[in-house]
Regions:
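NUDIX/MutT-family hydrolases
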Residues: 96-139
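Conserved N-terminal beta-strand and adjoining loop/helix that marks the start
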Residues: 1-21, 42
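Short aromatic/basic micro-patch
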Residues: 33, 93, 119
């Protein structure tokens, strides 16, 4: 069963000293975002959900290094199918927990939920992202990586 939270995972890699971020283009909405998905009742923690979603959506190895970000957004529940049946009429927002993941793979496999992905600089990624919550998490991750505070 779908749990009452969302996860956002921002894949990143180093090319020399440059940091690049992978963005995915959603098949259903045509917008750019990080890896996003919901917690399931079998996930023990939001980090476990993040690892599962990253594996499902981009085939990122679960042993990859994850950074737990301080950024937490509130997502209106109406964005989720059957939200009232899942969580009741009194649930108006759910939290979105954010993570970065260091990707070693050169080529990532996309799930059917996305049409393409691209590696971007921070500035390019910031311009492409659709959602403010993604931009805030990207900013935090970029600052942590630039300042080596992970």
């Amino acid at each position: 069963m779908r749990e009452k939270y969302q996860v956002l995972v921002l894949p990143y890699r180093y090319i020399g000293s440059e940091i690049q971020y992978a963005l995915l283009k959603r098949q259903d909405m045509g917008v750019w975002q990080g890896i996003a998905g919901g917690g399931e009742d079998f996930d023990k923690t939001p980090l476990a959900s993040a690892k599962r979603e990253a594996k499902e959506e981009m085939n990122i190895d679960e042993s990859s290094t994850y950074i737990v970000l301080d950024s937490i957004a509130s997502i209106p529940s109406y964005h989720f199918k059957n939200h009232q049946e899942l969580w009741g009429k009194e649930t108006y927002v759910i939290p979105e927990y954010c993570f970065g993941v260091n990707v070693k793979e050169d080529i990532l496999q996309l799930s059917d939920e996305h049409t393409e992905y691209k590696w971007c600089s921070y500035d390019d990624a910031n311009k492409l992202l659709e959602w403010d919550s993604n931009r805030v998490a990207l900013w935090e991750l970029n600052e942590r990586l630039k300042n080596d505070i992970c």
